């Protein structure tokens, strides 16, 4: 079994035309997990939260702003707890990011952004591959999302998790061949 096999299997089993890695919630017992409107885990940690609502809008929250009952009442459909948030909700790059200095350096990355309700941008940046790609800093990733017209954007799990799938194939060059993931974000075919 090769790395990424679980990722590809999840995509195939869900009839995904497109998929990107999620927040790798399976790597932590303390996190927020809302999938398809069902709250599975509600343990706020020190990471930002991104919520996709049933009306197609997307909003990011700092740990101190996040209120589980309020987002469920507002129609939370999916929630990812990794981050950080990249944009301020008006398309502007944040001046500081809620993360450690290490995570701010150039790395393979994946992000989800929202231009308007139901209009999303997904980005995966390869990295740690000398002569091919060094990756992106959070500021660089945020600038990409802003340049693409996103109002809000969120950094998903990166590193070996940064994978993008389209039409039955992984279409990027994941660091170390990728890793098996607990979750993906997908668009059905």
Give the role of each language-model region.
Residues 11-12, 146:
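Non-catalytic positions within long, well-ordered alpha-helices that form the structural scaffold/packing
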Residues 1, 21-24:
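Acidic carboxylate-rich catalytic motifs and surrounding loops in phosphoryl-/glycosyl-chemistry enzymes
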Residues 15-18, 183:
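A generic secondary-structure signal marking the coil-to-beta-strand transition
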Residues 12, 24, 117:
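Residue-level marker of positions within ordered structural domains that often coincide
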Residues 23-103:
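Active-site-adjacent helix-turn-beta-strand microarchitecture at beta-sheet edges
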Residues 28-45, 51-52, 96-151, 156, ...:
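Conserved, well-ordered active-site substructure
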